[in-house]
Amino acid sequence: MYCLLIRKERNMERKKGEKLPRDFYLRDALTVARDLLGKILVHQTPQGILKGKIVEVEAYMGKQDAAAHSCKVRSPRTEVQYGVGGFAYIYLIYGMYYCMNIVSNREEIPEVVLLRALEPLEGLEQMQQRRNVRRQQDLCNGPGKLCSAMDIQKAHYGIDLCGHEIYLEEGEPVTEEEIGVSKQINIDYAGEAKDYEWRFFLKDNP
């Protein structure tokens, strides 16, 4: 099992709303996962801008993580994970919902962070139309829901998150006291990995 080393990323020079640089993603997924809390996911769509604050994530640590898609055979599906960090790994679950992961670390180290929930910030009307849901709390409170609300699809597999269509911005600072930690969800098949506490979330976010 990995030992979690908290490595604080130096972001004092980044202002709120500034796009995250490539270096942010070139760290292990556990570090990136914690630092993603409070950051803003942005999608520039033809219908307008969609924004949501990241409030829940899970880290998947590659070859030594039985819950990771990249644990076993390298395949076309997981190929993007073997590149440098800062690209999107999108996959379909249950034949109907997409999930968005952020590739982390350096080349040939296939680690990702799954986005599990957002707090909607901008483009609420478009999100409500896409989800056919009115309550703001229900728009992005799950990995499939957030992809639907944010209009993230299979076509976005491999998109560069340092580009201009889908990217992440600096948000309000998050302290260690605000972060909750738990086991990941729905990975009972993953042997000892099911007990790894690699899910991180903002404690006071509904």
Predicted segments with their positions:
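Basic polycationic patches enriched in arginine
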Residues: 7-10
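Conserved, well-structured core segments that form or line functional sites
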Residues: 12-206
